[in-house]
């Protein structure tokens, strides 16, 4: 039976076959020195890993975050594709900021399961896989010459406080395993998970107080839970973070609905946040996690718009 192809699918298919070099060949504006170890999550640009790296290199950035390559979650990547990815990274002389794993981005067994479909970036794991995933993510980190693995805090339940003891204890156990492997876990505050705000992230990091567990501060995710990311959320995690995600959020004035925006096009005080990170001597890594999409759905150009918004903020620091 034939399937109808929508206009958006047709456009995305057409864009997919245009070499990214054609986009990168456009003149790039000069933004001056960047005071952070800035990179991009590659699948936010394109699923073609090589093309994604070409795009990052066109802006003279030297970091990237690995999550989903060639339509395969990083945890499911074959040995051949791992080597292919490493060869491309070496070609560009890139650094990997962290392994963007899906660890603990699934249901917490002690809590009622949430059945609705959520974005797991082609990962389909459960709590039974956790220890194996930790071990395999540590191997990936060593292979890609990074010390950091990003993790989560299980799908958010209606009352995260009831889940907190279980989440805390499992994260503490993961930190112990990471200590033995000399790996740093970075816990992302994810608005779909039980640790979603700066307040929640700061609390669990301080309660566990492990040198092998630090935060992946995501101001955009905090905003999605109605926290003021800067200065309120950041105040809770200051000094406890080793990785940051950059994206922006806007509010529809008629409906009040929140949605992703290009950096600088939303309400997050990114200038204040970046100035604070610089003044506080932040030495961790930073990834643009676009999420925002233009009306035409073009991921690469959406990322370009967001990246250039971020670079303009850097220029004015």
Language-model features, listed with the residues they occupy:
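Active-site acidic/histidine proton-transfer and metal-coordination neighborhood
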Residues: 14-15, 20-25, 107-215
């Amino acid at each position: 039976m034939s399937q109808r192809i929508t206009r958006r699918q047709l456009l995305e298919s057409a864009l997919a076959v245009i070499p990214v070099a054609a986009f990168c060949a456009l003149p790039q504006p000069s933004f001056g020195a960047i005071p952070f170890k800035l990179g991009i999550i590659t699948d936010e640009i394109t699923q073609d890993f090589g093309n994604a790296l070409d795009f990052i290199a066109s802006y003279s950035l030297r970091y990237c975050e690995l999550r989903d390559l060639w339509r395969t979650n990083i945890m499911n990547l074959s040995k051949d594709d791992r080597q292919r990815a490493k060869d491309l990274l070496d070609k560009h002389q890139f650094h990997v900021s962290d392994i963007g794993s899906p660890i603990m981005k699934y249901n917490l067994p002690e809590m009622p399961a949430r059945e609705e479909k959520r974005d797991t970036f082609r990962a389909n794991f459960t709590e039974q896989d956790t220890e194996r995933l930790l071990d395999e993510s540590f191997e990936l980190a060593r292979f890609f010459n990074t010390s950091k693995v990003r993790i989560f805090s299980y799908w958010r339940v209606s009352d995260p406080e009831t889940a907190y003891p279980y989440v805390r204890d499992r994260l503490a156990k993961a930190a112990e395993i990471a200590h033995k492997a000399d790996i740093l876990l970075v816990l992302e505050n994810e608005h779909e998970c039980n640790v979603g705000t700066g307040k929640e992230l700061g609390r669990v990091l301080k309660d566990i107080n492990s040198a092998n567990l630090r935060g992946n501060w995501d101001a955009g995710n905090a905003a999605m839970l109605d926290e003021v990311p800067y200065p309120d959320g950041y105040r809770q995690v200051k000094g406890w973070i080793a990785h940051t995600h950059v994206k922006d959020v806007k509010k529809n004035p008629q409906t009040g609905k929140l949605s992703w925006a290009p950096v600088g096009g939303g309400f997050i005080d990114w200038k204040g946040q970046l100035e604070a990170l610089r003044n506080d001597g932040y030495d961790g890594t930073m990834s643009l996690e676009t999420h925002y999409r233009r009306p035409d759905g073009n991921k690469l150009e959406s990322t370009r718009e967001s990246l250039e918004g971020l670079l303009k903020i850097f220029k004015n620091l």
